[in-house]
Amino acid sequence: MQKNSLPSLPPAISVIIPVYRGGDDFQECLNALAASNSKPKEIIIVADGGMHGTPQPDESLGAILLETAKAGGPARARNLGAEKASGDILFFFDADVTIGPDTIAKVTAEFAKSSKLAALFGSYDDAPGKRNFLSQYRNLLHHYVHQIGKEDASTFWSGCGAIRREVFFEFGGFDATLFDKPAIEDIELGYRIKKAGHKIKLCKDIQIKHLKHWGPWSIVKTDFFQRALPWTELILRDKNFLNDLNTDTASRLSVVAIFLLVLSLAAAILWPPALAVSAAAGLLLTILNRNVYQFFRKKRGGWFTLRVIPWHWLYYFYSGLAFGIGYLKFSFFYDEK
């Protein structure tokens, strides 16, 4: 008579949150974590540069608090938290988000379903925490990009992402030497994990709320210096031009179209017929991005969508500019060592 095998235990979750001057948003993050229906094995908070400007976690949360004397960036902070963790799954999320009551349960269930799943990540929800236009636009765009992305993902996102502990340490964690400030340390780690043949899943139903307030400068600074420039160098280093998320074919063509638009408008000052090229480029941009504009119209209405378009086109312009600068920098200064 064959004995019934005992059901396997669900993987233990270690929550790891890096925080730098977290303020009120971090308090909301902690409140949401305390309200979770499923409790993780442990909660590890890494205060990058100390607790100045960061609320003290309530003792009832039972969190392990690590502090660094000097800020070294989120990559190093997450690595420190991972070294302290003892769970099977390292669940990273940012200090300016709130998880849902069932978020931890969903993460646990995904890893319990497949032993071959190395990592997963989710997305922001469609109800950003801050009500100003740019915060709504920026966070809704992020939500849209992840919601149309491929579930069989080629990268990783630490804003709401989980990795098996053994996989994380197999690859040495986040590259804190290359990324000592907020950048694309999560994307770079995802590239390494995927290149080795591991499975990463984009779980579109695992959604968190982003509380960050976005303004004009914070958007351009983040997109240009912390994402587009280092991402360009990463793409060129790995020779990895993916057709997914922010680097899909429509986005690449949109970059070409926006530069065609700008150059033809400049040429029209001396040669007015160039305006026909400008009109064609504008039409092409609209057609290429019709789905995202339909998404914004459905979520926030026509007037909101009209205000989105110039910001979205500006995004393509400075992303293309960053690619050009990154290409030159890589060509002349990159050291393969």
List the model feature ranges, each with a label.
Residues 68-85, 106, 157-158:
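Glycine-rich, basic loop-to-helix element that forms the pyrophosphate-binding segment
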Residues 119-124, 136-155:
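Short, flexible, basic/aromatic active-site loop/helix in glycosyltransferases
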Residues 212, 217-274, 297-306, 336-337:
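Basic/Trp-rich segment in TM-proximal cytosolic loops or flexible interdomain/linker regions
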